[in-house]
Amino acid sequence: MSDQNKTKDYSKYFDFSDARVVSEDDEKKIIKIKGREITIYDQPNYRAGRKRKREDVQVLRPENLIPEEVANLGAGKKFLIRTYGCQMNVHDSENMSGLLLGMGFEETTETEEADIILLNTCAIRENAENKVFGEIGNLKPLKLEKPELIIGVCGCMSQEESVVGKIMEKHQHIDLIFGTHNIHRLPHLLRDAIFGKEMVIEVWSKEGDIVENMPRSRKNKTQAWVNIMYGCDKFCTYCIVPYTRGKERSRLPEDIIAEVRDLARQGYKEITLLGQNVNAYGKDLPGSYRLGDLMNEIHKIDIPRVRFTTSHPRDFDDHLIEVLAQGGNLVEHIHLPVQHGNSDILKLMGRKYTREQYITLANKIKQAIPNASFTTDLIVGFPNETEEQFQDMLSLVEEIQFDAAYTYIYSPREGTPAARMEDNVPMSVKKERLARLNALVNDISNKRNLDYQDKIVEVLVEGESKKNTDVLAGRTRTNRLVNFVGPKSAIGEIVYVKITEAKTWSLDGEIVSAPEVKAQ
């Protein structure tokens, strides 16, 4: 355990005056709070998490991440993972599931059946954290009823100092806390939590190495997430991600391509390349190999659809645009978060581009890929946002004509520069602005969807509609949701659908045969 984390003091968050150190060595520290022993291997530290050293990131290829002594630890037992937040968390949960299945556990969807419950958390907004703490509280009666139940908290919230402090003091029915950098250590940590009976904490503030050969249990047999890089170095002033996910680290191209080829052999129809800042891919690798080069190679692999997320405008280069314009399995959907439409606010956000630069980039992409759908993220109510600045956001949305947008009220994140800014905008004003923004976004989305009326589109069928099990649902290449009546055998397949009704957020249609498609 590092000296920095040995001396970490959580007293600024909670009252640990009754805590006492039971034992301490170079590997771990054991403390006792309110009668429960807590084994701490490492604790979150924002200062350490912010550092960006030029140390080489090692690529580890362990033959087996599951020690022999725990290989059958889960025999006759079940696990449940609840996943909050982004696609990266979904991917991480697939890795955790793979490890637990390798230890002999079975997966369940029933809380009462579970012997292990892991909450894979999101820290991007306060609302997400409140949901997790609500669930932590809801699980306490079950823990009292089943003392042998192991409850773990992992993901981005675990990387926050205040969250770990709150759990240590107020939620002592939690048995295990680990972070985003040491998922591969889950079998070891679980062993300690089960046999040691104390709360176990291991959260690395400094990112770990890239671990290949992770066992993985993919729930979806049609669409797959493929991590191509980890972390973010942008440090936007409102964002906690660089602290919770660490510095940018790219997987080697040959490892990514091998994974994509394997997915193609398994019959997957769609992959999404993942990264917190996906188009910064390759900047930390030797040479000039970038996302455009990777996409160009994947373009040649026999897999019908390839997506990527999430992009930062600063890293969207001309070569990437040229590659995407080839089409083929590279779908016509660009998600490019702008966050705001006013250059002064963008500067305060630390985005390092202006409104005009974003518009120029968007127009360049649209010119190269005319049929592309364009989606974005928007934050309303950044500290001291004026009505005039908000109007700039509305006018940007009008000018770009986004097909859809994820809109949010600014949520301060502890430890970020924006959280220290004074804010004179009342919440009532922020909510009213969000409503106005959503009305505009919905209106444009509806108009854009009307362009699909009576057209035949290619749809990858994802499953039954959430609203009606007699209806199937899937997505177009441009990521529009399409609902239609069809045979269950179509699930997981690519079909053609004629659009009969365009709605604000979805399209309704009827399945058509291949000859009709050719006729059109």
Curated annotation (Swiss-Prot):
Places the protein is found: Cytoplasm
Origin species: Shouchella clausii (strain KSM-K16)
Name under which the protein is recorded: tRNA-2-methylthio-N(6)-dimethylallyladenosine synthase
Lineage: Bacteria, Bacillati, Bacillota, Bacilli, Bacillales
Signal peptide: none
Pfam families: Radical_SAM, TRAM, UPF0004
GO molecular function: 4 iron, 4 sulfur cluster binding; metal ion binding; N6-isopentenyladenosine methylthiotransferase activity
Catalytic reaction annotation: N(6)-dimethylallyladenosine(37) in tRNA + (sulfur carrier)-SH + AH2 + 2 S-adenosyl-L-methionine = 2-methylsulfanyl-N(6)-dimethylallyladenosine(37) in tRNA + (sulfur carrier)-H + 5'-deoxyadenosine + L-methionine + A + S-adenosyl-L-homocysteine + 2 H(+)
Alphabetical keyword list: 4Fe-4S, Cytoplasm, Iron, Iron-sulfur, Metal-binding, S-adenosyl-L-methionine, Transferase, tRNA processing
Enzyme Commission number: 2.8.4.3
Family the entry assigns: Belongs to the methylthiotransferase family. MiaB subfamily.
Coiled-coil intervals: none
Entry cofactors: [4Fe-4S] cluster
Keyword Cytoplasm: yes
Binding of [4Fe-4S] cluster 2, residues: C232, C236, C239
GO cellular component assignments: cytosol
